[in-house]
Amino acid sequence: LMEVKAEVKDALLIKETQVHSKQGDDAKEAGNDNKNVTAYPQTEGVSERVIAQKQAGRYAVAYHPVGGMVPAQKFEEIYAVIKDAANAEVRVAPDETLYIINLEEEQAERIHKITADGAKNLFETSVSCIGSTVCQIGLRDSQGLLASIVEAVEPYHFADGVLPRIHISGCPSSCGTHQIGKLGFRGASKSVNGKAEPAFAFYVNGQDAQGEERFGEEWGIMLATDIPKFFIELGKVISEKKLSYERWYENNQDALKEIAATYLQ
């Protein structure tokens, strides 16, 4: 177990946070640039994006645009800051997060401001494939689904961690890794009054942590139009308990089934 203490100065407007991440023995070796940045968000509900590296005075900034969709001009803005920075790099994680690493304090502050349009809470770091609007074999618009959920829950201002990171795939190809999400969705269809309607299969309790790997259990099919309503109701229930989704789910699997049953076909 490796503890990473992020100590950033007031100019970055980021609170100190302790981060715990499972790493192998090799990750304890000092001075290795490849092992200075751990996964973001580090723990449920943590939104701090500036990470102090092992090297004194060096920082990394995590940037997760909603749905992994980076505005084209954003790369130009980032490049303008890091082009003359020694050893600065932009790395892409499998969960669609960008890490801009090996930054000095002033550079980290500028990158932090430039990337302020990214995810502001755990739920907005949800993973989605590109979806049927671009993918030729995609069945459903996974990006559109994520955008509609984010828009629907935004007015409720749920506390960070109340809604979990979800994974959305537009089809069985599983590019959104829906099987490993705490809540996952996979593109499907549902017949309503004899007409095929856009829908998603619903998966629960997936996990990709080393040693705890498991696929989520498929619970049924939800119409795409019902999924935002499901998350609004779920967020309200968990908010009343003043818990995060993870803590709430530990003792409320049956309650989740009751909420989902309203929307499952």
Which residue ranges define each predicted feature?
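Peripheral terminal and linker regions in Fe-S/redox and tRNA-modifying enzymes
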Residues: 1-265
